[in-house]
Amino acid sequence: TYPEYWAVQNFTSYNNGGYGVIVGNPDLKPMREYSAQLTYVLKNKYVFRGWFTHTDDLFMQTLYQQPDELRETFKVMNFDFQQQAGLMAAVPLKLGKWYSANLTALGVWLRQKDSDFYDIPFDRDIVYGMFTLRNDFHISSQPEITLSVNGMVRTKALQADYDLPASGNVDAALQIKFLKNKRATLKLYCADIFETAQINPYINFKGQRLDMDMSSYRHFGVSF
């Protein structure tokens, strides 16, 4: 996989009133990924999957705070490698005709290494989990009314020198199908009900310190 064209250009761009600088990297190399995956389906409905990936020269944009001036440098850089191993299970659930759901559980081990990341090389790893539950409550068949409530939660993760706090969100939607052959559909929805989807990444690593304050927004919608 090759980096984007802009990332390999020799340029310097300033932001945040000059306190931030975005720098191009003409020395960027393509990354190479090797992977293996095994999937098992039980009784045609329970899905289990395991995988391992090794990526040489993984590239991503990083942030570094200069030690001799009040400035943050953003630059797409190659890491030595990234390794990831994971297990996934997807389980359907059903109670009569009124309730159906799908539970997905994911466990991941992640390691990232960069031995020449400025003056603070890193070799970091973490185990994190992600769980998703999609619920459908079938309230009525005539007209067809379905209430969907979906939730996701993820434990703490990392990215380069960033720490990514745990996150989660809940969405809900009410769908009504009516008229002949249910040709009309009215949908009311609310996304990120508890305003928790956005995380506040931070850096606290070898003298680097950064705290980000991001905002989450609940939003409503209607479609017909």
Language model: regions and residue ranges:
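Structural signature of Gram-negative outer-membrane beta-barrels, strongest in the C-terminal barrel
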Residues: T1-D56, P143-N150, D163, K182
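Outer-membrane beta-barrel translocator domains and adjoining extracellular loop/strand segments
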Residues: Y5-S13, G18-I22, T53, L58-P67, ...
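Outer membrane beta-barrel strand-and-loop segments of large Gram-negative receptors
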Residues: V23-N25, K29, S35, V47-T104, ...
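Residue-level signature of outer-membrane beta-barrel architecture
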Residues: L38-L42, F52, A89-K97, N135-I139, ...
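Transmembrane beta-strands of outer-membrane beta-barrel pores
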Residues: T1-P3, Y34, N44, F52-D56, ...
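Conserved C-terminal beta-signal and adjacent last beta-strands/turns
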Residues: R124-F224
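Surface-exposed loop/turn and secondary-structure junction residues enriched for glycine/proline
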Residues: V8-F11, P26, M31, T62, ...
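In a subset of proteins, long, contiguous C-terminal domains/tails are tracked
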Residues: Y40, N44, M88-V108, I199-F224
